[in-house]
Amino acid sequence: IGFHLAKRLAERGDEVFGLDSINDYYDVRLKYARLKEAGIAEEDIGYGKYVESSKYNNYQFVQLRLEDRGNLFNLLRAQQFDAVCNLAAQAGVRYSLENPYAYIDSNIVGFLNILEGCRQYHVDNLCFASSSSVYGLNTKVPFSTKDNVDHPVSLYAATKKADELMAHTYSHLYGIRATGLRFFTVYGPWGRPDMAYYKFVKAAFEDKPIEVYNNGEMQRDFTYIDDIVEGVVR
């Protein structure tokens, strides 16, 4: 999502600064390929190093972890951003069962650093990614923002609910305009290879069985990437 949003903003003339940890949750070659598409060469990237795009003169990139408070605050202090859009998080529901600390570091500590940075360096507008997973055991459909979200069924979902509460608190205390968007399974070009639709297509091409959970009784909504980006921009 961050890749498509950065391109959209750069193409409409905004000054854009992209940040990514480039972790190995999935194949980093895809991450570097996205960056190349945005004019950022892999060989130019180094941790904490600001890189200017060869394709967009209004786009820069830095490899950085959100939990690295010192470097993150240095960036926010130097750039004096009008708005921050936080789409960075440790993703995946099942992965959180085996790697819980990765979710606390990125999704809780990292997001707190974003909030505190916005407070200290006077960023007026914060948009951040929440998730449909916060609805947990809700059985009523369609889901609504008025629904109870107090019963998450994964650590990933719990961190996203926590992010919403933290953003609400900072908005109340410090006047930060914070908007959380509960994304529903985003699909489209350059998407993550661990998502179900990529796995289904890969299995079909390889003439292998498609792995289905919950005896095929599961339902899920999908949202195309262009619609997600349009919603964020608005």
Locate each region found by the language model.
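N-terminal Rossmann-like NAD(P)+-binding domain of SDR-like oxidoreductases, especially those catalyzing
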Residues: 1-186, 226
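NAD(P)-dependent short-chain dehydrogenase/reductase
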Residues: 140-142, 165-234
